[in-house]
Amino acid sequence: MPLPDFHVSEPFTLGIELEMQVVNPPGYDLSQDSSMLIDAVKNKITAGEVKHDITESMLELATDVCRDINQAAGQFSAMQKVVLQAAADHHLEICGGGTPPFQKWQRQEVCDNERYQRTLENFGYLIQQATVFGQHVHVGCASGDDAIYLLHGLSRFVPHFIALSAASPYMQGTDTRFAPSRPNIFSAFPDNGPMPWVSNWQQFEALFRCLSYTTMIDSIKDLHWDIRPSPHFGTVEVRVMDTPLTLSHAVNMAGLIQATAHWLLTERPFKHQEKDYLLYKFNRFQACRYGLEGVITDPHTGDRRPLTEDTLRLLEKIAPSAHKIGASSAIEALHRQVVSGLNEAQLMRDFVADGGSLIGLVKKHCEIWAGD
């Protein structure tokens, strides 16, 4: 399928997607019933969409195009209420978090969807292992060239986004020692990590043509980069965050990305170059392994900075942009989080350290999501 023209959208508008876990009490393992829930809510959603993702244990909540985080929060809140009622009617529960703490990938059923079945044929068991749960944020752009500039700018802050959203320390019943373990799942995919370097939209079109020669890429949706342009929406899509445990934290993360995008495109503070990515995977690893306690390295100077310090610096830089777009509350909440030194991954570990079980942890996550 050829790459569509870049659809011009209103700059800085938002679209947010949350991949939620569908679990089956009292054992709180993943259920395979998302299709049943989607059927139950399809005529009750007035804004946004509830839909499938790769496997039957995944339920995606997606907003419509929103002007700001308050509008997005309102849409999510209404969807959440409908989904929770449908889940209760079918003796199921819903929670966030980037990975199910103890699920077995072999049990996961890929949705009966042509694209997902084709992906299963291409990638085999990797797709079942990819039953992990993330938050994706789309930001509107006025042109393809703006999208490429924004993508490179946001890529500088991938470690910050990963650390702030970290919520997947447990996998397959084990403490992985990572803050988020979810990003590691995609390391075997040929398109894992950053997008190959291009400097403008014309070069991106040439890149896509080259990738399509592999026959594994039918559309932009088949590319699993950390950040990717979405020409059919006219957006840049950030894909590195774990699904948070609360709706409020998901909205705050979206506000962070929207405000960062506004700062990047209005002030153009960087002259991007391919060397910017020289230490990308090393800095990304620091955020995954250590969360906000990680240390990132500047590829141009060799300077090393604590991720906590650099995140506070980012929040300060984007505060004026956040004020202009109505996202100040998000930046203030994230500032408090960084100063406290806590993320959701650490709270999960604290629960287990205090004697809680992994089953109890998922139950608590369901209570947190329903109570937010």
From Swiss-Prot:
This is Putative glutamate--cysteine ligase 2. Pfam families: GCS2 (PF04107). The lineage of its organism: Bacteria, Pseudomonadati, Pseudomonadota, Gammaproteobacteria, Enterobacterales. The gene is ybdK. Belongs to the glutamate--cysteine ligase type 2 family. YbdK subfamily. One of its GO terms (biological process) is modified amino acid biosynthetic process. ATP-dependent carboxylate-amine ligase which exhibits weak glutamate--cysteine ligase activity. GO terms for molecular function: ATP binding; glutamate-cysteine ligase activity. Its EC number is 6.3.2.2. Keywords: ATP-binding, Ligase, Nucleotide-binding. InterPro entries: GCL_type2/YbdK_subfam (IPR050141), GCS2 (IPR006336), Gln_synth/guanido_kin_cat_dom (IPR014746), YbdK (IPR011793).
